[in-house]
Every structure is written in C-alpha cells, then in structure tokens.
Amino acid sequence: MMDLPVPGEVEGLDMSELVLTGEGSEPEYAFMQGMGHTYLWLDGYEWRAVRDKQYTYARYLKDGKELLFDNLNDPLQAVNLVDNTVYQEKLIELRNKMADKMDELNDQFMPCTWYRDHWTEDRIIKASARGRF
C-alpha cells in the first residue's frame, strides 16, 4: 500500500487491493493461533482456531476442548454448537480446514514454553513455524 518492497520472510496475504478499492479476492477462511501466556511463559492457555464468514471453530491444547460458534446468530459466542448434531458437517469441515492450515504452516501446536525455547532469544522472535527469519 506504500509501494515498499515486501521482504521474502513476511508471511500472509496481500489484501491491499481489497482494502484500497473494495474489489479483489478475500480468503475463505482465517486461521488464528493463540500461543499462550507469552509474557510470563505459562503453559496451558494455547489454542488454535479457524473461521469463515459465519462460523468459528477453536480447540484448546491442554484438554482438547472444542468450540463451534455461529457468529451471525450468536455474535457474543455464548452458545457452543460442537455437540449439536445439526452442525456436525460444519464442525468436520472446519476441523479439516484447521488441520490443513496447521500442516501447511508446520504448526506443531505445542505448549507456550516450547515457543520460548525454539522461537525466541532474549524475548526477541527469531523464528516461526516456517523457520528462522
């Protein structure tokens, strides 16, 4: 958007055309990673999620708990639909999308302290799932 070169190690999608003109393609899904409590490096709060225009699916590492929300009909995400048989097809779709994206990113879904030990040095990020910067 500022006509600056994009370094090769930058991850993500170029959505500048969509932002600037309102035209262009947008991703069908968004992938989200919660690496845990990285300020104090506490394990037990790690999660992954994927969402489309209507639904959000998330899973916690610690206990494997799954969440499925209908963002259009439940914008506060108060009703977990994961056990509702009406939504099983959507649940499976989003589980698979999340697994595919994690495979693509080499996301091993590890405890918070693993990221401290493998991706940082003196609190400076030195690597990501795709490797060193």
Report the location of each language-model feature.
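Short conserved micro-motifs at the rims of enzyme active sites and ligand-binding pockets
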Residues: W41-Y45, L61-K62, F69-D70, L81
